[in-house]
């Protein structure tokens, strides 16, 4: 797994609300490098209710695959991390970088704060008119 090519920024076009009820998350990886990408996402204050969802390749260019998932938001306080798999190799990728999943107890408050990317609150002002208009055809 080429970890150097993996990229996500929670305050960018890699994580943003596309409507008042939908939050889009993207991950970049080396083209053809990963077998599976799972997004683990949920309410940061009700972390035990998190969901594990497979991400699909949204697009590719010469160097990278871009994975994405649109999360239906029921609470605007979102936290998430990625589980990356290639063959028998697994890595958890979060705000503090990479970790082996078996070494992290994600259910401990300290661990989830260390691991998770955070989008603190989906404010109605953060949902741009352009995003609303662009996704009316969905």
Protein language model regions, located:
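Single conserved hydrophobic/aromatic residue that forms the stacking wall/gate
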Residues: 131-138
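Glycan-association/targeting regions that enable binding to alpha-glucans and other polysaccharides
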Residues: 1-129
């Amino acid at each position: 797994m080429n970890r150097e090519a993996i990229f996500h920024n929670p305050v960018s076009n890699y994580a943003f609300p596309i409507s008042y009820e939908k939050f889009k998350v993207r991950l970049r990886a080396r083209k053809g490098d990963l077998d599976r990408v799972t997004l683990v996402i949920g309410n940061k204050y009700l972390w035990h209710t998190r969901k594990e969802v497979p991400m699909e390749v949204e697009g590719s260019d010469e160097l990278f695959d871009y994975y994405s998932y649109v999360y239906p938001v029921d609470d605007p306080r979102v936290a998430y991390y990625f589980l990356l798999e290639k063959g028998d190799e697994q890595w958890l990728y979060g705000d503090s970088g990479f970790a082996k999943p078996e070494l992290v107890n994600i259910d401990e408050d300290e661990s989830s704060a260390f691991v998770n990317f955070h989008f603190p609150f989906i404010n109605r002002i953060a949902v741009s008119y352009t995003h609303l208009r662009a996704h009316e055809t969905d």
